[in-house]
């Protein structure tokens, strides 16, 4: 009888873990050129939902397994604004109380991992890989971040999965503009963009062969290893940002193109408004998110001429979508951030539905290696 009661208690405990509150770790980086505004928003909403949440910054963060095999993460204190006061060398280094981790109840949002060796440290990527090896659910996984860190990889995946997108070719050297133009087989105006970039930065309007060649040469003069894309221009009055979570669209907004510009990014002056999607647009957004292996993504597209019948043109998928803008736009209806967090009460939405730690592929016991002073 006692054995049956214990088995039933274990069953109930397992079901509660599958459909209930979880613990949330937010790993991010507060860059002076790209402030971490979404991280504090997620912390705020998670606390309102009574979730245990820990904010950590990649700079200075380290993780370890203790003698009992328990995983912990340490971080400098992260302020309410997402900023992290870094050590100066004049005062003792202080860490937050370490956060206990377990893949059965800890969800990790790793925002701001960027591109290893280019816009972020390789160690940030490596730390995320350790967590993946141990069965943690990552929002998003390292593969998704790599897929989305390059607009060219976005295009490759779109084509592989037959997702409608503007014609795009890559310009691989400073004298490659003319050849790329011929391969694209599209008329001016065209869009020139760097493969790595966000918020509309690095996107250029090109109206002639002369300006195309001159701009490409200038870009390669500044950085000989830059990747430059040439893309057909799809005329539109607005584009759309949809937030896709575990196979569902939880919110969307329309971003009108500001007067005198061709970009619709909020950072470039667009004033977004709520926007309802058609069934076709919803289905295609979900496919686009799946193509990059994303669990929570921001999907950007230009609507088709007939939104009910014509597939939209997908521009890119973002693996760390900013939520401040869409939260503000939809706040009278609901909180997008809260809806995202609520989705993961259901453990079946977690990546591979982890049940227990996998210690067969762990990294070093302490990462990065620390000295006695913790640095």
At which residue positions do the language-model features occur?
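Short glycine-rich anion-binding loops that position phosphate/pyrophosphate groups of nucleotides
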Residues: 113-115, 195-197, 320
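A short glycine-rich, hydrophobically flanked beta-strand micro-motif that places a catalytic Asp/Glu
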Residues: 230-232, 294-306
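Protein kinase-like catalytic core scaffold
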Residues: 190, 251, 297, 313-316
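C-terminal active-site "lid" helix and adjoining low-complexity regulatory extension at the edge
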Residues: 4, 8-14, 276, 290, ...
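Phosphate-binding site of ATP-dependent enzymes
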Residues: 201-288
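Short glycine-enriched loops at secondary-structure junctions
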Residues: 143-148, 249, 255-256, 302-308
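Conserved N-proximal alpha/beta basic substrate-recognition cap immediately N-terminal to
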Residues: 31-167
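Active-site nucleotide/adenylate-binding loops and adjacent lid/helix of ATP-dependent enzymes
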Residues: 16-19, 24-28, 128, 133-134, ...
